């Protein structure tokens, strides 16, 4: 199984994803690590990425997800996956793996604009900052088929809830 933890910046995807992977003894990958240097620089400057900017990034994340599934490995991967079209691409199985999409579980972390803005204001050393928050909320297409988790609780409580809702406890 692969758990895709999604949401806008500042929802705690990396913190929650790492903690979840540690608790389950699963592999972990952060989509931020798949961004090109050019994409990171754009975001650092507060410039929202275009779909063309995101295309190779999404392809690399998709490849990682399906590599784990093909190998029979369990993993947690974080990705903003703001648009339904991005999620459709990530969940689309490569040739020969049709029927395997049920091995991917989508977890949507969400919070109020105010809560996320406060978190971003406190966050240090990340290339994406508060300047992108409004554009991320505007771009977000809330997922239809995801486990929806409010991020006003602690990361530990959020992980407990995810594990409970996925019957992993």
Go through the PLM ranges and name each one.
Residues 98-119:
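Conserved phosphate-donor/acceptor-positioning beta-strand/loop module used by diverse small-molecule
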Residues 18-61:
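Conserved substrate/cofactor phosphate-moiety recognition/catalytic segment
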Residues 52-100:
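Glycine-rich phosphate-binding loop used to anchor ATP phosphates in small-molecule kinases
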Residues 9:
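The conserved Walker
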Residues 122-161, 169:
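Small-molecule kinase domains that catalyze NTP-dependent phosphoryl transfer to phosphate-bearing small molecules
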Residues 2:
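Walker A (P-loop) ATP-phosphate-binding motif of ABC ATPase nucleotide-binding domains
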Residues 5:
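Hydrophobic anchor at the beta1->P-loop junction of P-loop NTPases
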Residues 13:
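Conserved lysine of the Walker
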């Amino acid at each position: 199984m692969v758990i895709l933890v999604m949401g806008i910046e500042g929802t705690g995807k990396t913190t929650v994803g790492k903690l979840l992977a540690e608790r389950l003894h699963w592999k972990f990958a952060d989509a931020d690590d798949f961004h090109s240097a050019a994409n990171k620089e754009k975001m650092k400057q507060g410039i929202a990425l275009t779909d063309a900017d995101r295309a190779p990034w999404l392809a690399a994340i998709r490849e990682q997800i399906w590599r784990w599934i093909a190998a029979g490995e369990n993993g947690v991967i974080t990705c903003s996956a703001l648009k339904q079209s991005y999620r459709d691409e990530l969940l689309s199985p490569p040739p020969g793996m049709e029927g395997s999409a049920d091995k991917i579980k989508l977890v949507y972390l969400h919070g109020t604009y105010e809560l996320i803005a406060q978190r971003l204001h406190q966050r240090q050393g990340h290339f994406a900052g508060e300047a992108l928050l409004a554009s991320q909320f505007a771009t977000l297409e809330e997922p239809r088929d995801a486990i929806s988790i409010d991020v006003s609780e602690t990361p530990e409580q959020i992980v407990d809830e995810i594990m409970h809702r996925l019957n992993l406890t």
